[in-house]
Structure formats: C-alpha cells, structure tokens
From Swiss-Prot:
Name this polypeptide is given: Uncharacterized HTH-type transcriptional regulator YoaU
Similarity section: Belongs to the LysR transcriptional regulatory family.
Single GO term (MF): sequence-specific DNA binding
Species name: Bacillus subtilis (strain 168)
Start and end residues of each HTH lysR-type domain: 1-61
Domain of life of the native organism: Bacteria
Gene that encodes the chain: yoaU
Length: 290
C-alpha cells in the first residue's frame, strides 16, 4: 500500500470544507483533480472516506473522521521536518495556525504578529477566532497548532500568559450601585447579564462555593452586546476584565463579590511536538505579554 502525500493534503482540505468546489478554489486546482485525488486515496487505502448524503451533502464517514485526524498529524510532522531543516539552514518558514478568542485578537495579537513578522517574514500566520471551548476543540483535533484559551486548560499542556478576573459593569441609571465598593452577586443575582467567554466554569465554582444560586437570566454571545444591554438598563453586566478592556465603553466598572479569577494561556497537545515556527511564535507571544 503506497500513499500519495499530495492526495492526503487534498483530502484534509476536502474534509475541512466538506465541499469539493471550495476545496478546489483554496487549493488552486480543478474540481475533477480534487475528486480524482480523493478517489485514488480511497482506492489505495481500500476505504470509503467520504459519502454524499441527500440532505446534508458531502460528509465524512466514521473512518474518514479518524483518517482526517491522522492526516492532520502527518501534515504537521511533514511541516515540522521542513522547518527543522530550514532552521538548520538559518531559514525558518512555513505556516502557524493559531486559535484565539476575540479579546486576545484585539489586545495581544496585533503587537505579537508585528514582532513575529519582523523576525520571521517568511512564516505565514492563520488566525482562527472562536470561544475558549471551540479553541480547545481545534487543538484537540489539530485544526490549529496552538490555541490561546481561558482556564481550565486540562487535558492540554499550557503556558501562562496572564491572569484575569471577573468584573461588573453597571447601568448609568443605577445610582444605588455607584457608591458600592463592589457588586454582591447574591444580592443582585436576579439582575445579572452574563457574556459567554470561557469563564463559565470559574463562575459556577464560585457560586457553588458561596451557596449562591446561579440564575442565568440573560446570557449574550459577545462583549459588545453585553455593553449595549447594560446601557439600556437591562441589568448588571458580568464580564472578564481582560475582555472588557478590548471594548470601548463609558460604563462604570466595579469589582464583584465573591471574587472570580481565571488564567489565560497558550495550549497545545505537547510543546515539544509543535513545529519550530509555532514554538517561536509562543516565545514572541510571551515576550509581548510580559
């Protein structure tokens, strides 16, 4: 059984896009060439990797999903081999795929990418944004080389970037809160607006520790929406200080009780196994944050 690496690369793209046309466009080859490569790969493996469903279109078979995960690992190893060779020849190139949540993309990434490009102009960077849970999933299935996510980091290896904590933002109409040193979450539990962003476990643990009932009266997907909700006096916003710093606003910020903290860090299956390019990006990232 001889496997063509080019066919494997094409399969990875098709497996990610689940669309022959889109895969062909991104690979800059014809649709028939893509279809032929998939057919040849299936023939060499004697497996059916993809099926076409009447309602859902192109889908991976169960074994196709397993092969896709292994194929991504093989691509990573191939890239690492070239990068190790290039590093030895004083010429680091390739591509780094990074999973990041929006606040990191706003607060940290511009400076980190600028610093990285000044040292490694031949390395391409692909930034994929999502929630912390999505990023952990992308690291797990090797869609990205590294991810930047909020704690807890298990089961991945992690390198700490910074500490973070939850704060409250209060509506301008709530005069009784302006003089408060902090917002007591138990007292105002019916007024809280939450923003999804990787702090859910930390919040849940704090509420459990202090025997406070966690009432998710209103939960939004992003910081901008939370700010607008608070502006319109719909409640008290609970958001991470790091995320809040990435959004312009004129609301009053208050500490909360009980105090809720979390960490933000870089995660990977193994930092020893990531490519030289990804390893260098982690070093630059940590230098920028410090």
């Amino acid at each position: 059984m001889v496997m063509n690496m080019n066919h494997l690369h094409i399969f990875v793209k098709v497996g990610e896009k689940l669309n022959i046309t889109e895969a062909a466009k991104e690979l800059f080859i014809s649709q028939p060439a893509v279809s032929k490569a998939i057919k040849n790969l299936e023939s060499s493996l004697q497996l059916k990797l993809l099926i076409r469903d009447k309602h859902h279109g192109l889908m991976l078979t169960d074994i196709g999903k397993e092969i896709l995960l292994l194929a991504r690992q093989m691509k990573g190893i191939e890239s690492k081999i070239y990068q190790v060779a290039n590093r030895e020849n004083k010429l680091l190139n390739g591509k780094v795929k990074i999973g990041s949540f929006p606040a990191v993309s706003t607060n940290i990434m511009p400076q980190a990418i600028a610093a990285f490009r000044s040292n490694y102009p031949l390395i391409r960077i692909e930034l994929i944004e999502g929630t912390s849970d999505q990023i952990k999933g992308w690291v797990e299935d090797r869609t990205v080389d590294i991810g930047i996510a909020a704690s807890p980091f298990e089961p991945f290896e992690n390198q700490l970037l910074c500490n973070d904590y939850m704060v409250a933002v209060i509506p301008p109409q709530r005069d009784e809160l302006k003089l408060e040193k902090h917002v007591d979450l138990e007292t105002y539990q019916d007024d809280l607006i939450f923003c999804k962003g990787g702090h859910e476990i930390a919040m849940s643990n704090a509420f459990s520790q202090y025997n406070i009932e966690l009432k998710e009266n209103l939960t939004v997907q992003n910081a901008e929406t939370l700010i607008n909700m608070v502006k319109n006096n719909l409640g008290i916003g609970i958001i991470s200080n790091f995320t809040l710093s990435s959004v312009p606003h004129q609301l009053i910020k208050k500490d909360i009780f009980p105090r809720v903290t979390r960490d933000i860090g870089v995660i990977a299956h193994s930092f020893e196994e990531i490519t030289p390019a990804a390893h260098e990006f982690v070093k630059v990232l940590k230098a920028v944050v410090i």
